Each structure stands twice: as C-alpha cells, then as structure tokens.
C-alpha cells in the first residue's frame, strides 16, 4: 500500500491589515496575495483581486460586519488574512473578536503620516491584545524626499511606543501596493520584504493546547456509585487524570481532584483543548458546582466582579435595542456559559449610548466570574443579545 505523502505542517497565523481609510489596506491585501501567488504558485491560489474590496457581509453573533478573508502561504507559514474595509466594520470586528489576530500590519500612507483612525486602530490593537504590529509605509513611491519618509517613520514609531508596542524591533517597510499590483519589480520586492518581515517578526501563536487548562462548566450531574461529573468543552490546555484543579467563579474557589475523564462514554487518560468531556470530581456534591463556573489548573485564573470594557452595542437593525441607555443601566453579562447581572457606568463625558455605538464602560457584576483581560462577553436583555465586548482592564 502506497504511503500517504508526508505533509510538513506549517504554523497557521491569523493576521490583518489595520490603519486609516484610503491608506491602502485593501490594495495591500491584494498585492500580498498576487505577489505570493507569483512567487509560490504551487502554494497559493490565483484570485480576482476585485473580490477583496467588495467584502461580503457576515453575521457573527447577530452583528453584521463587512469583512473579507484571504488565505495565502509563504514558505514558512500559512496565513489567514482579514480585511475589514469600513472603519466601523473594523472597530466592530476588533471588539467582538469576530477575527482574532495573532499580529497585524499597520498601513500608513507615506503621503499623509498617521491620521485619526491610525491612532484609534493602534489603541484598539493594544486593548484587545494583538501581540505584534509591524508597519507598511504605503504609497512610498509618491514621496521623493527621503527626509520626509524618515519623519513619517519616526511619527509612526512614536505612536507605537505611546501604546507600549515594541518600537525598536518593529519593522517598518516602505511599500507601494499599487505599483506591486502593476508588477513593478522594485515594489514587488517591497511586498516580498514585507512578508519576510511578517514571517520573522510576528511570533508563532501559542497553541491553545500549551496554555493552562480551562473548561467552562456547562452541566453537572451525579453518577450513582461514582460521584459528581461536570461536563463542558475544554477551551485550552490539557488535563491528566488525577490532576488537582480549582473551580472558579460565582462562589468561593474550591479545590478538587479529577479522578476520571470521559469522552463519548470512553475512559481517557487526558482531556485536550477543543474536546467535549465529562470530568469526575472527587469530594464534591452536585449542589457544590454550577454552570458558569470554570474548572482550571490551580492558580491560573482568578474571580472578579469589576472591570472596564470596550463594547459594541447592536443597532436596531441587528436586533439590538431601539432606545439609548445611560449610566446605572442593569443588564445580563454572558460570560462563556452563563449570564450574570451587572451595572454599567459610562465614562465621564458620555451621557448615553445609542444602538450602533461603540463605547468604553465600567461594569460591576453581582457575582464574581473567572476573568482575564481580553475575555469576550455578550450583553443580553431578556435573552437577546444587545451588545458584545471584551474586558480591557480588571479593577477588582
């Protein structure tokens, strides 16, 4: 029997283009795909570059986002590239986590330098935890003055450093997406250089499997003669049988040991990220545990009630509220598998929030939830989603 061809598996990395409108994000996305197709035709598909700009509407968790996904490969890696052409779409996408980015290319037109949206996108990238940014100084073919190019590069580096991005190491590559699409060799090389920099500078994502174990609890039941079983889908990490774990959230933290692991009625020695499993926990009664708690590697996550967040409030057309809300608005915050009531305080100077708005807010929950920065949640009212956000800072 012929052996199947050995495929060297490449790291898979999610990246995106960010930056001010009309600085060339979409053109650069097209140029990257074309240049990589020409360089590695066996690794990449040819595509019609007009399709990237007419980004299809996607509905994620009821939120409409215009977004296009492009895939391409370098010798080293496989990339999934997200491009959200509209500013509002981009902001929604970042906040709702419709596309998690392992790194991003900040596109700044050399003719303009950093603009308002450039600053807003860099701030958001910091708040939602994009690990690495590098810079494409686009439209560089239109600036002949070397001093001007150097000044724009310095401004961009200052902006990155003001948001605590690593500015000394961050590559800044001068590109012309349009000229690269037209096949001009100098600028084709600029896009090749950019992708070499992306390969080198954006770190391999830490796979979920290598993080500390976490399983949101969906259900709890008793098996006569064996004890209490909690079920859920492991979100990250691996768990071996007889490991000590903590149950965190809603009540005081409890310690226990996992004495059995089951998946589809088969006994397993360990549970892995992405698997739906039942865990037998020692010494706990059915009433000691509830949906909405998480079962975790000890010490890896803590329970909190107060946090700051970045939130997108659904518009009326997306099935959201029809009316604005004000400070002291009470709603349900849906984290992982459960709703917890919370009270919202709006930032100073924000009187009210309209449907369709993006806002920052502080929240106080009535029960603690296992929380870390970057954690996503939905805001719900009477069972329907009215907002989507992520934790930017834990305050208590």
Swiss-Prot record:
Mind telling me what this protein is named? Elongation factor Tu
HAMAP family recorded: EF_Tu_B (MF_00118_B)
Classification via Pfam families: GTP_EFTU, GTP_EFTU_D2, GTP_EFTU_D3
| Species classification | Bacteria, Bacillati, Actinomycetota, Actinomycetes, Micrococcales
Self-association or partners: how does it assemble? Monomer.
* Enzyme kind, highest EC tier: hydrolase
Q: Matching Gene3D superfamilies, A to Z? A: P-loop containing nucleotide triphosphate hydrolases, Translation factors
Which InterPro entries does the protein's record reference? EF-Tu_GTP-bd, EF-Tu_GTPase, EFTu-like_2, EFTU_2, G_TR_CS, P-loop_NTPase, Small_GTP-bd, T_Tr_GTP-bd_dom
Task: Give the region (G2) as residue ranges.
Answer: 62-66
What does the entry list as the binding residues for GTP? 19-26, 83-87, 138-141
The entry's Mg(2+)-binding residues are 26
The EC number of this protein is 3.6.5.3
Query: Which family, according to UniProt?
Result: Belongs to the TRAFAC class translation factor GTPase superfamily. Classic translation factor GTPase family. EF-Tu/EF-1A subfamily.
Q: Which stretches does the entry tag as region G4?
A: 138-141
Q: tr-type G domain: from which residue to which, for each copy?
A: 10-206
Residue numbers spanned by region G5: 176-178
> Which reaction does this enzyme catalyse, per its entry?
GTP + H2O = GDP + phosphate + H(+)
**Which residue intervals make up region (G3)?**
83-86
Indicate where this protein resides in the cell: Cytoplasm
